[in-house]
Amino acid sequence: AGAKEKEDGIRKSQKILLTWLVSDERIFGQIKDYISPEDFSDGIYRKAAGLLFQQYHDGEINPARIMNYFTDEEEHRKVAALFHTRIEELTSEREKEKALMETVLRIKNHSIETATRNLEPTDMAGLQRLMEAKKELQDLKKLHISIN
């Protein structure tokens, strides 16, 4: 699989997570300590995630307000798609929890890989943050996300 395919897979994971966050507010409480808007790809993904996370902190989820933030027609359409990604039918709660966990891990792992590639060799503070992020990733693997 090439870098392009991997990037598309990550974007799909990010869309799925944003869709889940909009459709089930309980999920945010379980992932907020592990995933931040900075874990999303640059551009509209990160911006939309940032606005959504801010709405969670303010206690009022309103995807339409987020979409209205993007005035460019093309961006507006893409953001609408972010919140309405078709998620394959997962029949059991357990399947949903497993898929959610895999999605969160994939996004966090990609975020760490990207930060590692872009890290300046002399950036000790950045290196320290990466080490902490990798430890969080290990903790995250032990976490059980419950959606019922």
Residue ranges and their predicted role:
Residues A1-E60, I112, T116-L119:
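Non-catalytic protein-protein interaction segments used by genome-maintenance enzymes to assemble
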